[in-house]
């Protein structure tokens, strides 16, 4: 798979293009291949150093771009690499099946769990089918149905958050978008099973929160979580969406800042260059964190679990 490089990654892209060109020559270069091996090794070392330098000092706007990277792993990628025996469940049993939300039963290290997450889609056709990862009310009601099923069968719930926000169309509003989100918030706060929420890309406003109330909230290293997009914030504050970089810095939407404010619990590391550089390693990092947290939560009885979650939610806004 050829990688898409972001604007701030252009120096890395140029170096990697040179390395690939030399590899092609080396494969067909006969006697010159030995000399090229040394040059390739030097360029690879230089590329690694450049990546380490760039990714050690990313700004909030650059992180926001990484969170939206078109090759970033989505919910179905984590289902493939971190879980086994996934059985998808469809429909809200009231109106329709919203493809922007995927969910079903799976096993995590052999333990039955319910997995629910946003799914954006890769190709144009899939993006349209999945509405670019922006759920309608029926998507959130499907998620609610799966959560209630999980509670009935005493299965922990794992959610993956990656959406620009809930779909704001007229039809969605007519079918009760705000009610669907609000009901999910209420029900998730009172579920008697462990709930672990993970922001893996964009965590956009109520559309993210609707599957984001839990006992642990984790963020991948280069994900974002905010009430509005940087472009939207810039358009409101400065009437200029080009000021999105300044807005991103002011909003505090990156994982380290949110952990400092105690709005999230853990930051899950990504491979150098971002999750899309090594989705399998990212999924393994995610799995390790989920297994660890699930073991901790399973030590609590129902009453203690609910009290812990209540205290966690009530602590928001206090430093």
From Swiss-Prot:
GO terms for biological process: fatty acid biosynthetic process; malonyl-CoA biosynthetic process. It is found in: Cytoplasm. InterPro entries: Acetyl_CoA_COase_a_su (IPR001095), ClpP/crotonase-like_dom_sf (IPR029045), COA_CT_C (IPR011763). GO terms for molecular function: acetyl-CoA carboxylase activity; ATP binding; carboxyl- or carbamoyltransferase activity. It catalyses: N(6)-carboxybiotinyl-L-lysyl-[protein] + acetyl-CoA = N(6)-biotinyl-L-lysyl-[protein] + malonyl-CoA. Residues 35-296 form the CoA carboxyltransferase C-terminal domain. Pathway: Lipid metabolism; malonyl-CoA biosynthesis; malonyl-CoA from acetyl-CoA: step 1/1. Pfam families: ACCA. Component of the acetyl coenzyme A carboxylase (ACC) complex. First, biotin carboxylase catalyzes the carboxylation of biotin on its carrier protein (BCCP) and then the CO(2) group is transferred by the carboxyltransferase to acetyl-CoA to form malonyl-CoA. This is Acetyl-coenzyme A carboxylase carboxyl transferase subunit alpha. It comes from Vibrio atlanticus (strain LGP32) (Vibrio splendidus (strain Mel32)). The gene is accA.
């Amino acid at each position: 798979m050829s990688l898409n490089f972001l604007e701030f990654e252009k120096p890395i892209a140029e170096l990697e293009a040179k390395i690939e060109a030399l590899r092609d020559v080396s494969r067909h270069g006969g006697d010159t291949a030995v000399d090229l091996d040394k040059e390739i090794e030097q360029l690879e070392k230089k590329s690694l150093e450049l990546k380490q330098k760039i990714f050690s000092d990313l700004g909030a706007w650059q992180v926001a771009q990484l969170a939206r990277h078109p090759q970033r792993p989505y919910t179905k990628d984590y289902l493939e690499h971190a879980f086994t025996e996934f059985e998808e469940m469809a429909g809200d049993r009231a109106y329709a099946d919203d493809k922007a939300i995927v969910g079903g039963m799976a096993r995590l290290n052999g333990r039955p769990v319910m997995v629910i997450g946003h799914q954006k889609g890769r190709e144009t056709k899939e993006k349209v089918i999945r509405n670019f990862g922006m759920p309608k009310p029926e998507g959130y009601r499907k998620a609610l149905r799966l959560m209630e099923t999980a509670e009935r069968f005493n299965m922990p719930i794992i959610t993956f958050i990656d959406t620009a926000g809930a779909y704001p169309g007229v039809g969605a509003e007519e079918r009760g978008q705000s009610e669907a989100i609000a009901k999910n918030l209420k029900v998730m706060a009172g579920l008697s099973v462990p709930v672990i929420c993970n922001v893996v890309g964009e965590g956009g406003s109520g559309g993210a929160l609707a599957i984001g109330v839990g006992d642990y909230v984790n963020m991948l290293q280069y994900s974002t979580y905010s009430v509005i997009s940087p472009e939207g914030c810039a358009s409101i504050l400065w009437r200029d969406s080009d000021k999105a970089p300044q807005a991103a810095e002011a909003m505090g939407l990156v994982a380290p800042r949110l952990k400092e404010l105690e709005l999230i619990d853990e930051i899950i590391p990504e491979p150098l260059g971002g999750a899309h550089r090594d989705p399998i390693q990212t999924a393994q990092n995610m799995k390790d964190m989920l297994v660890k947290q699930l073991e901790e939560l399973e030590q609590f009885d129902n009453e203690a679990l609910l009290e812990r979650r209540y205290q966690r939610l009530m602590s928001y806004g206090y430093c």
